[in-house]
């Protein structure tokens, strides 16, 4: 899985296939040649690698034992983790087509990793415990419909989104989309508390925490939920309910394409596409196993990419949250992780790792052009994370 791998993304799909279809043991060699996978040889496996265009090496048992000995050496920053089973993956997404792509469903489809699309019905009807891993992407859990009202209030897709959400709210006995999304947020919290793995990108990161903090107040203006925002909405925020963020300030204007100051302001970042980068931390694979798994890559420097939520102001991140990827000069975090109850969550800023500034209505990214994308690899690390046999973080 180093620089000579022809298709990093599909390699994850082969590992998933081994777990799912062959019930074969897969070893994840952390920090060994870019985080490689090792499994017992079979002609089916070799054929699968060839079919998917994944680079591989057939080695002897002696060579495999030598690799294991090298990794076990206390002086090297490597580790070997068993992948135990194929996680059951759910993607929270409307069943109707959206005018933007979803990086996770794109890379899952490209890597040939199966997933199930669920939405409000399934969440509120108690289906989440059927899954190990849940993805949230370009979603607005505050009930403000992505704050697209100012620019797209008459667009057919926006009108349909509002109508569908309000219909769903009435179906479940709620007065507004805001109340519906609050109930969904609390169900997702239950899923995590019970041991589920949550992965969120773009606006699903900050709006999830905002909705948790605002569960006992109203942060929506009249055009979103039929009544006005609570005059004391800011003062009524309960940050203790948040997964990752603290002390943020709401963006109350319905004309502003922001939810709060959690997200960095693109107009103030003073960075170009060429210089917009973030760095992954080099964790100890033996002692800090969880972040080491989530940061496996063939490079420590990853190209940045924008989204409605691009990156997080570090000053607004809770002290017990791991910042795994950052731009230190800009004081912003891009990739963070934490524990909640028996489960975990990972938040990843930005919309599409290979489309720097994805706009509404643009065609989806063709991953055939980006088979070695470091940004997409981070997503796939999270996909296999629930399968890994791991111990508690030591430092």
Which residues are covered by each model-predicted region?
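Extracellular ligand-binding/catalytic regions of CAZymes and related secreted enzymes
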Residues: 6-38, 316-395
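Extracellular/periplasmic catalytic domains that process cell-envelope and extracellular macromolecules
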Residues: 82-85, 126-129, 191, 339-341
